[in-house]
Amino acid sequence: MAVKIRLKRMGKIRDPRYRVVVVDSRKKRDGRVIEEVGVYQPTENPSYINLVSDRVQYWLGVGAQPSEAVLALMKITGDWQKFKGLPGAEGTLRQPEGKTPFVAPDNGSVIIPEAITPKAEKAEEAPAEDAAPAEDDAEKAE
């Protein structure tokens, strides 16, 4: 039985997500798998790659052949270099930057002074100006 490590397509149309699986080479792309050893989500920025390194090393050790796409993923994570004994086993995988948490104001108020717009002040001034011409029109009518 020839065993391959390849991608199994998941997700929706135009939103691909893949599972990295160990499968008999004679099975269909999305057919029955022996073991799932990772996840690949190319649409995220940076791409999300998660391989279970010890299981990948085991399957490579017993003779499983990676597909071209999985080989590229293994080079990014450093699993291929680790298997071959090459330098660079730490890989080149980039981690996403963390989001900065929201910090509430010190005085406990939910309203932030910078959030108040000057439009509110202009709106208060405008009705006063509109009321003055209306009074002038009333005097002219008398």
UniProtKB/Swiss-Prot annotation:
Extent of Acidic residues compositional bias: 126-142
Cell membrane found in the keyword field: no
GO CC annotation terms, alphabetical: cytoplasm; small ribosomal subunit
Protein keywords: Ribonucleoprotein, Ribosomal protein
Gene3D superfamilies (alphabetical): 3.30.1320.10
Stretches the record annotates as Disordered: 88-142
Protein name: Small ribosomal subunit protein bS16
Naturally occurring in which organism (per UniProt): Kocuria rhizophila (strain ATCC 9341 / DSM 348 / NBRC 103217 / DC2201)
